[in-house]
Amino acid sequence: MSSRIDRDVINALIAGHFADPFSVLGMHQTQAGLEVRALLPDATDVWVIEPKTGRKVGKLECLDARGFFCGVLPRRKNFFRYQLAVTWHGQQNLIDDPYRFGPLIQEMDAWLLSEGTHLRPYETLGAHADTMDGVTGTRFSVWAPNARRVSVVGQFNYWDGRRHPMRLRKESGIWELFIPGAHNGQLYKFELLDANGNLRIKADPYAFEAQMRPETASMICGLPEKVTPSEERQKANQFDAPISIYEVHLGSWRRHTDNNFWLSYRELADQLVPYAKWMGFTHLELLPVNEHPFDGSWGYQPTGLYAPTRRFGTRDDFRYFINAAHAAGLNVILDWVPGHFPSDEFSLAEFDGTHLYEHSDPREGYHQDWNTLIYNYGRREVSNYLVGNALYWMERFGIDALRVDAVASMIYRDYSRKEGEWIPNEFGGRENLEAIEFLRNTNRIIGEQVPGAVSMAEESTDFSGVTRPPETGGLGFWYKWNLGWMHDTLDYMKLDPVYRQYHHDKLTFGMLYNHTENFVLPLSHDEVVHGKKSILDRMPGDAWQKFANLRAYYGWMWAFPGKKLLFMGNEFAQGREWNHDASLDWHLLEGGDNWHHGVQRLVRDLNHTYRHHKALHELDFDAYGFEWLVVDDNERSVLIFVRRDKAGNEIIVASNFTPVPRHDYRFGINQPGRWREILNTDSMHYHGSNTGNGGVVHSDEIESHGRQHSLNLTLPPLATIWLMREGE
């Protein structure tokens, strides 16, 4: 028996107050000989076993009734592989001792993690099934530099924090432990004795799967295989590609009619994916699928940044959904939330008893609008956690793009704060320099590591250079939501047509700044909640005029420079606001053909026509791709412009935003010849009045608007028409 183990050490170890369990537990060379020590609460008998022969090598004596065993092995001088035969409640179990294994994290990984430059921290941190020295199990690691003790607790140890205290790697602040026998599918958490001596039970920040609310445990789950991007998917994200995005909240797109329960990922693959393809969309954008405790956050307050929510199935089910989308020719955009996180006790908040992931000062670390906490981007390990997450979704799931939420709240220290409620940066300014550098670095790494993948910014201010390269002072995003265009055009459309002539600039102003960024035109979920009404219900007039206005607006939007985004339900003109707790109003499409069918057909035709004609998408971000033909006819609320492709082919777009048909409307054109009406939002096919131009019109050699040739058209009421030149 050893006399070297101090009673205070044993007490501290059993009480969970000892920070260095490997200095005590496991096999050690002592003056008395080779000694094995184990902490096995509730055990009554422990033997050391030779694995090759199964022979008992020595018995461990119980030095403390609470489960501390120790024994010197006779005739043994050198370290060897061993197992422990442990009797619990009259039943003997053969186990491998976690404390016989050496350090897990390689020195280079530890250094990169400390420097914040480990591109894929999720490959090292978290829970990973592994085989060590011929023993299968799971290696656990967690960053908690200020904790006094960290243990793994889970289904494999009765959630008892005494049984598996971890090793601290002081150079990195990471705790690690290999637990033999722990396997995929088992639940676990980390139990921390924090910097202040308080006990905390935390979910794994790097968990690849987690329980669905209200439960909060992490789940051991293997790292998914990498997904190789196809050339077609890469091309579909390019600036000259047609991009029409269908934005979806998976929990409310459609539900089971019998119990209002969600569709699963696999059911969504069978229903949502073919629908989006049939409608002609090119991309699916998913509101956040990261695990989150509060349904009403729509996923924008995530606690499991690396775990797809279990609401709709398993991690593999989600991969099945993504694969189905790709097989249907749809790219997938994931809404990503690196701006803030909820303050739930089980998550990142005060993780090790200190403000580890968030700022300590609430003027920097607390978001009063959402009652959430703000990441400390200046801490290298925190930024690394987030950058790694971006790569994780792109490389391991095949996500084609990330849409970054609430960028303005990240890059401005005074965002939604009054004077005295924020702290200036080191130069006295309002910019969050650390957040700006984080975004630049993230976009730079995406570009370097995932060819063809892109990022999109929801940025609501006039911050300059959101879509410019970091090396030129930009943030490095590929695309930016054009919230200014959205607000201006919706403000215009909600006006009674008689007043629109006084607000003509609402539709023209967007072109003054259109080429400053690479824009997406968004009619997103944010525009159909919180009392804003549905898009349809914002339109003025009686039912006929509401639908006509909406169709004219969509025709304008799909032709205007910029990529397109439409939130689910808007494609068939849902009349009520979005409710995340219920299905879309699919019953509006039941029964006989109606106005809702007309809008749905229009959106489908808009998508297919938009994709077919390069002039409508190839030069979205080049001034050559757009030209006004009629910009100043505010009295009649008429606007006409040309979209152009690289080869010079033109499509004419004419909108009449009054209910008065404009007959014999002459305007100058660039290219004389025969022009065909390829889309008319007033067509009877869409339940319009069917006013139009009979399909084909010929230009006249009559000067108009400073051009030698012109067209004489009928502009339908509250409508947009598209014309394509067919020949001389």
From Swiss-Prot:
CDD domains: AmyAc_Glg_BE, E_set_GBE_prok_N. Keywords: Carbohydrate metabolism, Glycogen biosynthesis, Glycogen metabolism, Glycosyltransferase, Transferase. GO terms for cellular component: cytosol. The keyword Transferase applies. Pathway: Glycan biosynthesis; glycogen biosynthesis. Signal peptide: none annotated. The keyword Transferase applies. It catalyses: Transfers a segment of a (1->4)-alpha-D-glucan chain to a primary hydroxy group in a similar glucan chain. InterPro entries: A-amylase/branching_C, Branching_enzy, GlgB, GlgB_N, GlgB_N_E_set_prok, Glyco_hydro_13_cat_dom, Glyco_hydro_13_N, Glyco_hydro_b. GO terms for biological process: glycogen biosynthetic process. Monomer. This is 1,4-alpha-glucan branching enzyme GlgB.
